[in-house]
């Protein structure tokens, strides 16, 4: 086998390996993002709670739920520079 063919096969193998590894990392990231909602994202008490002890606030009829920090947490974050 010529060196060019060997180099090509090595390159194709490396690209395939990197692609599979990237897909695994992406699926882990997507799964962790689904587990909880960040501030100002939609939430549901049963299926998608808020991250970082943020409250899930809903409209008066129980729809349009959104993760929101209370005023005290907002002031603390502002004071800490977050």
From Swiss-Prot:
Which residues would be cut away as propeptide?
23-34
Family membership noted in the UniProt record: Belongs to the neurotoxin 02 (plectoxin) family. 04 (U16-lycotoxin) subfamily.
Q: Which GO terms describe its cellular component?
A: extracellular region
Alphabetically sorted, this entry's keywords are: Disulfide bond, Knottin, Secreted, Signal, Toxin
List the Pfam families.
Toxin_9
Signal peptide annotation: 1-22
Q: Which SUPFAM superfamilies match?
A: omega toxin-like
**Protein name as catalogued:** U16-lycotoxin-Ls1b
Q: Which InterPro entries match?
A: Spidertoxin
Native organism taxonomy = Eukaryota, Metazoa, Ecdysozoa, Arthropoda, Chelicerata
Location of the protein in the cell? Secreted
The record's tissue-specificity note reads: Expressed by the venom gland.
> Which organism was this protein described from?
Lycosa singoriensis (Wolf spider)
Name the principal localization, coarsely classed: secreted
Q: Please quote what the entry notes about the protein's domains.
A: The presence of a 'disulfide through disulfide knot' structurally defines this protein as a knottin.
What would be an example GO MF term here? ion channel inhibitor activity
| Disulfide partners | 36-51, 43-56, 50-67, 58-65
